[in-house]
Amino acid sequence: WISGFTGSAGTAVILMDKAGLWTDSRYFLQATKELEGSDITLYKEMLPETPSITEFLCQHLKPGESVSIDGKMFSVQQVEQMKEELAAHQLQVDIFGDPLSSIWKNRPAMPDSPAFIYDIKYAGKSCEEKISAIRTELKKKGVYALFISALDEIAWTLNLRGNDVHCNPVIVSYLLITQDEVTYFISPEKVTAEVETYLKERQIGIQKYDE
């Protein structure tokens, strides 16, 4: 919305006097065309002459200034690395929610197509078997919990499918697996009575997507 770029992978950086969009080689041609005529500069990732996002910020911001990010869009590791690199230039990272929510008035709603069960004869293994295998690996690594945000991994783990992404049978959701419980974060309207029963029978808790 803010750039006009329609590719599936990219990061926009908006400063008071300039803006940039970082994307990978899959979208160089597309982004060049879609950003044409805008005030947004395309930065082609992985090319030697392209500054990283933090390098760009350090070049154009003054010590003491802050960088705001949507915490939902970055992993903990990414945030920690960003904080470390920016702190070296006396820049601060502030983590907020979605910065566009108050200005994008006609934003399309989240997809709400219902989830459905993927038959075991196609899945090969039950979700109980898969969760057990995940917990075994967590124990080996001395890890208590695994938070899964990759939609294909969630679909595989739970043997659930959906229609939230064009040509990709996944469901917009999150999954938290600990040694003691499993919690599935999903919009309530996606959960049919059949899916709710399926999850409860497997001791999988259900929470709202934005909890």
Where are the model-predicted features located?
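N-terminal accessory/capping or targeting/presequence segment of soluble
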Residues: 1-62, 66, 74, 78-211
